[in-house]
Amino acid sequence: MSISEGEDQPGASSNRTARRAIDRSIASLAIPALGALVAEPLFLIVDSALIGHLGAEPLAGLAIASTILQTAVGLMIFLAYATTPLVARRRGAGDLRGAVQAGIDGLWLALGLGAVLGVALWAVSTPLVGFFGTDAGVASQAVTYLAVSCAGLPAMLVVFAATGLLRGLQDTRTPLFIATLGFAANALLNWWFIYGLGWGIAGSAWGTVAAQWAMVVVYLVVVTVHARRHGASLLPHRDGLSSAGRSGGWLFVRTIGLRAALMLTVAAAASHGTVATAGYQVVFTIFSTAAFALDALAIAAQALVGDALGARHAERARQVLRRTVFWGLACGAAIGLVLAATSPILGRVFSSDPEVLTVLPPSLLVLGLSLPLGGFVFVLDGVLMGAGDARYLAWTSLVNLAVYLPVLWAVTVLVPTGTIALVALTAAFTVVFMAARALTLGLRARGERWVTLGV
């Protein structure tokens, strides 16, 4: 054995040990986070299943109302993403009191925004539903569900912020537990209110609102325990609210850019007719499902990177970057291979329409082949969020949108309707748009400007 070989072995062993430790940390955060992410859409699935037995009008009303609600709530997801790095940095710096306080400030911000959003949405619920141009019966059902659901908006946003607090403390198991309880309560209350009390679609909305506020109560108990343990105040601090507001504002801009890309892609699909729109809905549903696994890795990256930078361990933050990118690519490739292999038959799960089934397989193949790129993007997004690089994420989301728009215009205007249209739409979003995001995120991650140490 040479001297150099003898010297390299301890270093190699140390690197392997570090990688394994980071991998264990990633798994301990990502796996429960995945469970909590999967639980969230189950609320709507339960509502759909129960309301569907009331007839076509209530189900159509739910479709419209839930679209409005999901759009409004989706724009507020920054409350979780902004709170996590603020808490994680302070935890990494050893300031657990400050970490919990930052999370509590986020809760108050969420409550205030939720109250304003709830009142505003309630006030315009009728004209918003009217925008969809449905008949009077469906519109009435939609307005009923939407108006009642507005009472739960503050609770939904508080849950976002509380989840972000616990993620920052590297606790993803408690959110999974609370989400599971909330799902069970939602199912039972909805059944009772809809069928036991005969409240119809309003009963479904009230059941969900009650479950959401019950989740808030449980979260507040958990947060109070943390506050008392570490000496944090349950009242908001002005500086903390300002900090959360600044970070959240930039992440809100980022979310606007992403939502605009999604909505414009749907509009492009609609321009190619019913078959393309239905096919795109199937493709996007599968993409969203695959994204749960990739988003769970991004959540782990947020918490671990924020903690490492708060502790002034730049190399550990880079190690987290490397390992989460590895797992993002690996998970994307694994899911993509399964999707590509099943692309000829997977569409039958979602549709029995012969035309839709004809256009789906090539598009699902494109989606499967693009998922490693998606894994790369999701993870780097989480890394830069954890680093608190919100301003960069905001501006580049607008740049990415600007790059995407001409491509989407070309797909809308120049591509003929049919199978090629759906393939082009799928490639535009999952390849072109994701490649633009990969470039802007990758360039940032290769540099050092995101590595800001301390609190």
Task: Label each residue range with its predicted role.
Residues 1-33, 87-154, 185-189, 194-249, ...:
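Short alpha-helical transmembrane segments in multi-pass integral membrane proteins
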Residues 33-85, 149-156, 242-307, 328-335, ...:
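Transmembrane helix-bundle signature of multi-pass secondary active exporters and lipid flippases
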Residues 45-49, 127, 161-165, 187-192, ...:
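Alpha-helical transmembrane segments of multipass membrane proteins
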Residues 48, 56-59, 96, 172, ...:
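Membrane-helix interface/capping residues of multi-pass secondary transporters
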Residues 59-119, 159-175, 279-343, 376-388, ...:
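Small-residue-rich hydrophobic transmembrane alpha-helices
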Residues 78, 183-184, 213, 296, ...:
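Hydrophobic/small/kink-forming positions within alpha-helical transmembrane segments
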Residues 174-178, 203-207, 395-396:
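Hydrophobic alpha-helical membrane segments of integral membrane proteins
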Residues 179-186, 285-286, 398-407:
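Small-residue-enriched core segments of transmembrane alpha-helices in multipass membrane transport
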